[in-house]
C-alpha cells in the first residue's frame, strides 16, 4: 500500500476498504491523517456552546441500538409541548449557548406543523436575547412528520426553514446499507430515503451534519460504502458542515442483550475510523468532530491527532448517550473543553453551527 500517494489523491472506495482492513500500518495511517488535518484546517480545534433538548422519549421506532425510547405508559416517559421546549432554549441562551439541538421521537402526534410550532416558539422567546442557531430534527423525524402532515419531504422542509430551522443533525444514518439497516433499525428510513431527505434539505438551504455509527454488526466494507455515499452527496450539494463518527454504545442497547452485536468498537477501530475518514474526505468534508460523550476525554484528545479538528459541544442536556450506557457525563463547561484542547497543544476557538469563528 502506497500511503504517501494517498495524501495527494482522492482515494477510491476500494482503497478506503484497504485502509480499514490493513493491520500492519496503523501508526502510519494515523500519521498521514494528522498531517492532512494540519494541512487542511491547521492547529485550531473548534467547539460550540450548545444545549440538547429532547422534547420526548416516547417513540414508535424499533431501533435495536436505542436505550432512550420509552412507551407512553412508562414512568419515565415525557413529552414537552412547544412552549416548554422554548423555555429550555431560553435557559440555554441565557447561559451562553449559541446553538440548541432539538430532537424527539416518532409519533403520529408529531407532524411538520408541530415541529414548525416548536421553531416558532423558540424564535419568539429567544430573539430579544440575540440569535441562537436551531439545529433540529433528524432526517427520520422530518420524513415521519411530513407523512403525518400529508406533505412531501420538500414541502415539509420549506415550512421548517420558513419557521426558523437553521440546520439539521445528519443522524439516523447509522450505516447506509439496507441489509444492515434491516437488522439494526428495520422500521427506519431506507438508505435512499435518508439520501433524499438530506439532499433536499441542502437544496432548500438547510445545512446538515453527517454521521456514521460503527462497532455493531457492520463489516469494514460497509464503512467504506457509507463514507463513499457521504462524499458523493457532498460533491453534489456541498451541504454537510461536518462528519461525526459515532462509536456504538452497547451496554444498554436491546440488540446487545440479544447477543446480536459486538461489544462496541475497540479503541484501535475508534482511532482508525477518524483517520481513514480524514484521508478519504480530505477537504471535501473538512470538519471531523470527535465525541467526548461517547469516547471520553482522553480518547477524544488522542483522536485530535488522528484527523479530527472539532471537539463538539458543551451539551447542557444530553440524554441519549447516557441512556445507552455512556459513562462520560452529559455536560462539559466551556473552560473544560478549552483545557482539553490546550492539553494536546492545539488552539481552542469557539464556533457557531456553521463553523464561523466567534471572537
UniProtKB/Swiss-Prot annotation:
Keywords: 4Fe-4S, Iron, Iron-sulfur, Metal-binding, S-adenosyl-L-methionine, Transferase. Residues 45-282 form the Radical SAM core domain. Its cofactor is [4Fe-4S] cluster. [4Fe-4S] cluster binds at residues 59, 63, 66. Its EC number is 2.5.1.147. It holds the Pfam family CofH_C. One of its GO terms (molecular function) is 4 iron, 4 sulfur cluster binding. Pathway: Cofactor biosynthesis; coenzyme F0 biosynthesis. It is an enzyme of class 2 (transferase). The keyword Metal-binding applies. It catalyses: 5-amino-6-(D-ribitylamino)uracil + L-tyrosine + S-adenosyl-L-methionine = 5-amino-5-(4-hydroxybenzyl)-6-(D-ribitylimino)-5,6-dihydrouracil + 2-iminoacetate + 5'-deoxyadenosine + L-methionine + H(+). Binds 1 [4Fe-4S] cluster. The cluster is coordinated with 3 cysteines and an exchangeable S-adenosyl-L-methionine. Catalyzes the radical-mediated synthesis of 5-amino-5-(4-hydroxybenzyl)-6-(D-ribitylimino)-5,6-dihydrouracil from 5-amino-6-(D-ribitylamino)uracil and L-tyrosine. Consists of two subunits, CofG and CofH. Belongs to the radical SAM superfamily. CofH family. This is 5-amino-6-(D-ribitylamino)uracil--L-tyrosine 4-hydroxyphenyl transferase.
Amino acid at each position: 500500500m502506497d500511503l504517501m500517494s494517498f495524501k495527494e489523491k482522492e482515494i477510491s472506495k476500494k482503497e478506503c476498504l484497504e485502509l480499514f482492513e490493513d493491520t500492519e500500518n496503523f501508526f502510519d495511517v494515523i500519521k498521514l491523517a494528522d498531517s492532512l488535518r494540519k494541512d487542511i484546517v491547521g492547529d485550531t480545534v473548534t467547539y460550540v456552546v450548545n444545549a440538547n433538548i429532547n422534547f420526548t422519549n416516547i417513540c414508535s421506532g424499533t431501533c435495536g441500538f436505542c436505550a432512550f425510547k420509552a412507551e407512553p405508559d412508562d414512568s419515565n416517559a415525557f413529552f414537552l409541548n412547544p412552549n416548554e421546549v422554548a423555555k429550555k432554549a431560553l435557559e440555554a441562551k441565557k447561559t451562553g449557548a449559541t446553538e440548541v439541538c432539538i430532537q424527539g421521537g416518532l409519533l403520529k402526534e408529531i407532524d411538520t406543523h408541530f415541529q414548525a410550532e416548536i421553531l416558532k416558539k423558540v424564535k419568539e422567546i429567544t430573539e430579544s436575547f440575540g440569535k441562537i442557531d436551531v439545529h433540529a430534527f433528524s432526517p427520520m423525524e422530518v420524513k415521519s412528520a411530513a407523512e403525518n402532515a400529508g406533505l412531501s419531504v420538500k414541502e415539509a422542509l420549506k415550512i421548517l426553514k420558513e419557521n426558523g430551522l437553521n440546520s439539521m443533525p445528519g443522524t439516523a444514518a447509522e450505516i447506509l446499507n439496507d441489509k444492515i439497516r434491516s437488522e439494526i433499525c428495520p422500521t427506519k428510513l431506507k438508505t435512499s430515503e435518508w439520501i433524499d431527505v438530506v439532499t433536499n434539505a441542502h437544496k432548500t438551504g438547510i445545512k446538515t451534519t453527517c454521521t456514521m455509527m460503527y462497532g455493531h454488526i457492520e463489516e469494514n466494507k460497509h464503512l467504506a460504502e457509507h463514507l463513499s455515499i457521504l462524499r458523493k452527496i457532498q460533491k453534489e450539494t456541498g451541504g454537510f458542515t461536518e462528519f461525526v463518527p459515532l462509536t456504538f454504545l452497547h451496554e444498554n442497547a436491546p440488540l446487545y442483550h440479544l447477543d446480536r452485536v459486538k461489544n462496541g468498537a475497540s479503541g484501535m477501530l475508534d482511532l482508525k475510523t477518524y483517520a481513514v475518514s480524514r484521508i478519504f474526505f480530505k477537504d471535501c468534508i473538512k470538519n471531523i468532530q470527535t465525541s467526548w460523550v461517547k469516547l471520553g476525554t482522553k480518547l477524544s484528545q488522542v483522536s485530535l491527532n488522528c484527523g479530527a479538528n472539532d471537539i463538539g459541544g458543551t451539551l447542557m442536556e444530553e440524554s441519549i448517550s447516557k441512556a445507552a450506557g455512556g459513562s462520560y457525563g452529559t455536560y462539559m463547561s466551556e473552560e473544560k473543553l478549552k483545557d482539553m484542547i490546550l492539553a494536546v497543544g492545539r488552539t481552542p476557538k469557539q464556533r457557531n453551527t456553521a463553523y464561523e469563528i466567534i471572537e
